[in-house]
Amino acid sequence: MKYKLKQIAEIINGSTPSTSNSEYWDGDISWITPKDMSLQMKRYISNGGRNITQKGYDSCSTTLVPKDTILLTSRAPIGYISIAQNELCTNQGFKSIICGDKVLPLFMYYWLSTKVDFLKSISNG
């Protein structure tokens, strides 16, 4: 049986609060960037180099994604994949994939891992 990704998962974009407003930073909400993924290179990720505050969260269009969401970098570097170990947010360099009941997050992680070269090839035009 074949499915389109949007039939079995919800795809979420991230966002970045203004970096010039100090009230938005050093809070309790985990916020992940592609750089964080490149530094950790692990199957699971729980936090990055910076956290945002509730004000920072409210100021932009980032979304708090649930535990077990697949995080896929969609901007340089493209193709880093991890699974959220807890609720967290990402910047705009991600497509976060919240799996539905038709697919297990770990399966999605491994399946996407086999598609990295393809994702890179289509991202370069």
Name what the model sees in each region.
Residues 1-15, 31:
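Non-catalytic DNA-recognition/assembly elements of restriction-modification systems
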Residues 15, 118-119:
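Short alpha-helical functional segments enriched in proximate histidine and acidic residues
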Residues 18:
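Acidic/polar loop patches that form or flank catalytic/metal-binding clefts of enzymes
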Residues 26-28, 90-91:
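Short acidic/glycine-enriched loop/turn segments that link adjacent beta-strands
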Residues 33-34, 49-115:
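A short beta-sheet element
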Residues 38-51:
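Short, basic/aromatic beta-hairpin or loop at an interaction surface
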Residues 120-125:
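Short, intrinsically disordered, charge-balanced linker/junction segments flanking boundaries
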